[in-house]
Every structure is written in structure tokens, then in C-alpha cells.
């Protein structure tokens, strides 16, 4: 439910339950670098870890969580924890509206250099993705991240999707971010999943799966720690090579999703803008026929 306001989400909750979904994934709720309704990608250009933007306030989030809970639905939030919004015409420089706490210390930032080789783990985890990269390994930055997530937990959030999780290093690579973060969360049993798309190394995927569920379009060696999708916001909305499903019909995507549900434990259905396919009876039927342990996220 990306870029939906509170009323739209609340109105959709009863139908989501009727369709057999177990959780609703809400788009980023962090303060954005610019006000007003913008392109979809602006939701991934936050100023830091302050909660509340043009789509949802703290009160909205709390109300949504309470109403969803009354329908036995969990609420998940899409979180941007490793970068901020960029300055106009200078992709790797933080926007002037970025939180002053972050701007004040150069140690809070990655080197201003983009990833050049996505097959090179060192390159991926130490450099930027065409946005200003945060040094999430710095204890003060990690403290801000933990406080942000715990504030959402206090509002009733039961799960988090971590955007671009692939760019955050693992213990075998010398970084303890993931175990440290999980230990810092005030509630156990949260559903945590991270975007680790196009990663070919099964060893890397397996290590991520020790800490978070791995979000992707194909199964890794730990299927019970995978969250699979037939389409994501990136694959539908992106204009570059990432937009590999934008020419597929909603019906094609739905059929692919139903096939995933029949065979895999955790699945995510992306709701296209102004598209009602998620209400199709075929999805409800697929959920009813799925394994009982399956977790279905809209």
C-alpha cells in the first residue's frame, strides 16, 4: 500500500482480511526532503528518521495498526535506513533539509562514490546507490535507526521491510549491524525482511537469512526465510532495467502470484496504483488453498 493515505488504507483493511492476507505493507512514513505529492521515488528520499510525511502521521499509523489488529492483520512499514534524500543536481550530497543531526558529522556518511560493480560485495556495502549513503555502522547512526524502529513498534507496527538491505554488510564481512539492530529492538517476534535483489551468492543470501527474511523474486536455499513476489514497486514503476514487469498485465502478475502462494511460505503482492486486481476472487482462492503456515502480505 505504497503512497496510500490513512483513509485509503483503513478502508482497504476489511477487504484485505477477506482476501486472506495476513499483513499490510505500508510505504515509507519518514519525513521527505520535499513537501507535496511527488513522483513515487520521492518516498525513498527521506530527511532522516523522523516519522510523518504527507501520506501518514504518527496518529494515522497508530490508528491503522489498531484497526488492522482488530481484523487480525499485522501492519508492516517500508523503512529507508541506509540513505537520505539528495541535493538537486548533486545525487551524492545530502539535501539541505536532511536532519541536522546527520549533517553535522562527516563520519555519519559513506564515501561520495557510487557502486561500480554490483558483483563485488565490498563495493556494494561501502559505496552509494546514486543517493547519499549513511554509514549505518557508526554507533550514533545505528542508535537513531533503533530509536526510529522502536518508535514505530510503540505505535503498533509488527514488521519492517528494509529497503536496499543488500548494501548493508554482514558479520562475515566484518559488520555486526544486523545482529546489533535485532538485539536493540524492544519486541521479539517482529517480521523483518530485507530487499536483497539480484544477489547470486547463496552464501550471502544464507547469511542474510540468519537475521532477516530475504525479499526477492526467486527462492534462496532457505525457503522458509524468503519473501517472494511476482512484482514489486521497483519492477513496475522504474523506467530503467529494474522495471521488468511494467509491460505485464495485472492478470499475468496475479497468476504468477497465485502460483507463488501455492508453493512458498511467505509472499508479497504489490498493489499497482489505482488497480483493483488484489480484490480478485482468484487471489482469495489461492490463499484459502495455501499452506496454513504461509504469510501473505499486501
Regions found by a protein language model. Give the residues of each.
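Active-site-proximal helices and loops of the catalytic beta/alpha 8
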Residues: 13-16, 30, 41, 63-77, ...
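Substrate-binding/active-site clefts of carbohydrate-active enzymes
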Residues: 1-155, 170-196, 202-204, 217
